[in-house]
Design a protein with these regions (language model features):
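Catalytic nucleophile-loop/oxyanion-hole region of alpha/beta-hydrolase
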Residues: 113, 117, 150-152
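Cys/His-rich metal-chelating microdomains
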Residues: 102, 259
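Short cysteine/histidine-rich zinc-coordinating motifs and their immediately flanking basic loops
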Residues: 107-113, 265-271
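Positively charged n-region of N-terminal signal peptides that target proteins for export
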Residues: 1-5
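Flexible coil segments in periplasmic/lumen-exposed cytochrome c-class electron-transfer proteins
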Residues: 24-94, 133-252, 287-322
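Short, cysteine/histidine-rich loop/knuckle motifs that typically chelate Zn2+
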Residues: 98, 255
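Short microdomains enriched in Cys/His and/or Lys/Arg
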Residues: 116-129, 274-285
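Bacterial N-terminal signal peptides
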Residues: 7-18
Length: 322
């Protein structure tokens, strides 16, 4: 509790200065906000039951794409799913476990919510519902679905989902690799996937986060793993920023998010989470599209960050055990 009070006190002090949100002059980085091309089409379902390693379950592609049916390949990995997580409520409240997976590990296109504080999850749903939390790239479908769901879901359903996901232990599913060259990629459904053939290109200051096994990820296997390619030196640069704020550029992340970035009380942990997602959140905070009640605590800390800073912070956080 003392740590939380200290974090809040720091936030109040920081917020005593005028909050200036950066104008949208610098376009959102396309690699962090992948948008499906106009001709994007899902492969047709031939009705064949699909399988993933270490599971006796079988599902078709149609089932994998059903927004009201959370595929549960590994039911022994977690407690029983609440109805709102497993099936949602038609027509407007999709199953939480579809995008976030049955036990919350997510994909690069959305948030990992396993182990997040219940209070934080409840507040984010309120922010999506009120319009306080949007996105810097409105054409992206994942945040559109969150906003639609938040407007239709009941408080009781939110509490059920928040209690379930907050009680789960997050798992390490990301391998962070510093490299000067990365696989060439394509947008494969609001996320990036490596092109077949092994062609590479310069990383050029980006984070390129891709599934290790594309088919498993598209089948919503919660045990899917990812590789996040980050620029050389970015993890150490991020560690310095997180621990000392870059000599006045920002407040140290560790004050509010904890010494290992695992969170403090209602403040979410960042360790082991998708670096692509983290960059989007930093950018959205900086540009005012994420503006809930706790956002004023973040605004002074992100206003002076460059995109390279965001990449470094996200790379460092993702490299830590959740």
């Amino acid at each position: 509790m003392k740590a939380i009070q200290a974090a809040l006190a720091l936030g109040v002090a920081l917020c005593a200065t005028p909050l200036i949100v950066r104008a949208q002059a610098d376009a959102p980085p396309a690699w962090a906000y992948p948008v499906n091309p106009p001709d994007f089409k899902l492969s047709p379902d031939d009705g064949t039951p699909r399988h993933v390693p270490d599971s006796t379950a079988a599902f078709t592609l149609t089932q994998a794409r059903d927004l009201f049916f959370a595929l549960d390949w590994h039911p022994s990995d977690h407690p029983p799913l609440p109805e709102i997580v497993a099936h949602g409520r038609k027509p407007d409240v999709m199953a939480c476990g579809v995008c976030h997976r049955a036990d919350g590990p997510r994909g690069p296109e959305n948030a990992s919510i396993a182990g997040l504080p219940a209070q934080y999850i409840v507040q984010q749903m309120a922010d999506f519902k009120s319009g306080a939390r949007t996105t810097s790239v409105p054409q992206r479908i994942p945040p559109q679905l969150m906003i639609k769901t938040a407007k239709g879901i009941t408080d009781a359903e939110i509490e059920q989902a928040a209690a379930y996901f907050s009680g789960l232990k997050p798992r390490a599913v990301i391998k962070v690799v510093e490299t000067a060259t990365v696989p060439k990629t394509r947008v494969a459904g609001w996320f990036l996937a490596a092109l077949p053939g092994g062609e590479t290109e310069p990383i050029a200051g980006r984070i390129m986060e891709v599934p290790e096994d594309l088919e498993r990820f598209e089948l919503r296997d919660a045990r899917s793993h990812f590789v996040a390619y980050v620029p050389p030196g970015s993890i150490e640069q991020g560690r310095q920023l997180a621990s000392n704020g870059g000599n006045g550029k920002s407040a140290p992340c560790t004050i509010c998010h904890g010494p290992e970035l695992n969170g403090v009380g209602p403040i979410p942990g960042l360790a082991g989470r998708s670096p692509s997602y983290l960059v989007r959140q930093l950018y959205d905070f900086q540009h005012g599209t994420r503006a809930g009640p706790w956002s004023p605590l973040m605004a002074p800390d992100v206003i002076n960050l460059t995109l390279d800073d965001m990449v470094a912070l996200a790379a460092y956080a993702a490299s830590l055990p959740p």
